[in-house]
Amino acid sequence: MRSICFNYINRLILLVALALTAAVGQAQLLRTSYFMESAHYRMQLNPAMTPSRGYVHLPAISNIGASYMSNGIGLADLIDIVKNSDEADYFVSNAFMNRLKDNNHAIANAGTDIFAAGWWHGKSFMSLNIGVKVDGSLRAPKSLFSFMREMRGMSTIDYSNYERHIGNEELNVSAYTEIGFGYTREVNDRLSVGGRVKGLLGLGNAKLKVNKAIVKTNLEGLDPNYDWTHGDPAEVLRAKGTASIDVEADLESSIQGLNLLTNGKGYIDDLEFKVSKMGIAGAGAALDLGVAYRITGGLTLSAAVTDLGFIRWSKGSTTVAHANTSDLHFDTEDEGDLMRFADIVNNTQPLNGDLLRLRIDEQAAKARTTSLSSSIVAGVEYAVNHDKLRLGALYSHHNDPVKAQDEITFSVNLHPSSLVDVAVSYSPICCGGQSVGVALKAGPLFIGTDYIYTGKNTKCCNALFGLSIPLGKASKSN
């Protein structure tokens, strides 16, 4: 019988999936907006890139979006993995396997503003924001899904000398509230510098890392194409020999109100979440810094680093667990022993809780510190026709626990009037040269994407929709 243990891991995967696909897209993901003069969303990328006018966000209908990016796992594939059932068979598809890379990762950085406003005061621009952000990422090597196919009997296996390594999996999710104050100063007609100081209130953080997972068998008399999920158990009982599972994995969770429950053997097999006890699990701070310099009348260089910060999670909200597979050695001389092995390897979940056997380590629980996923951008733009046409190129680097992302975005921006700003972009790296973006700012309305949706199994897609009220008059320098 499948252990309930996996339910906890599956919920963590679901939480990451929500971070990747829920309606949250934060402006820092929308590179297409970077050279749009009237779009205040670009300040999330560089606090020195001020909008032409102040603004007030409309609560609940501003900064609504979604974002997903992966090098190998398509959006539809991710949904199949997350909603995985006992009879899941997505991994038996050759098309699915052909889409995968040797090392697959999926990354998202998302958030929404509860309140945000910005305004000009002379040559200074100031802003306030209160928002919620979620960072999520996962890593899953192709060997993991190859192992699942082997256990379905899709490969000819010599079980008398079988060894499969399926480690190097990782899952991260972090949610926090951000309270920020930004200040930008036009030092002169050429130079602008800006910064944003942010206080962070941690809502929750979880990290699961599988360093190694090794499955070995020395079994005689077993069909080389035996299906451990649907095969006849009598065939397993006729086999002779030994098998073993060796895992190194760690789980760190800092969420107020979450209790991990264990079975009689001390392994996590369920969770209890009390909404009444949900609260602040940690606190921290972060800093954004940016600069923009106009070299000539039309040529401007800019650069920024954002989300330089940390969150310190409290000891009282933290639970630590480690894999304990010391007793996962099986011998057909012991009655029913090999059936225990079968119950583990026939699990069709990509992160198999029966295999990990996570045991809470109360002595290891302590306050812990995590870093934010910081970003670096550097841009160059050339404006002509009284700034009504802008040509831009933006380099961006985003740090993430599972994979750093680099991208170059080329854009053409049209600004025919103070009410309308349009941009079209092309980003050649992350999505194999198939990423065209577009953004529109028309009065209070903003809508944009870096990756126009190309189908249900796209590997890169995002969208951002927002409504804001213009505040004050346009800066004289814009």
Q: What residues fall within each predicted segment?
A:
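Bacterial Sec-dependent N-terminal signal peptides
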Residues: 1-31, 380
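Subset of outer-membrane beta-barrel
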Residues: 28-478
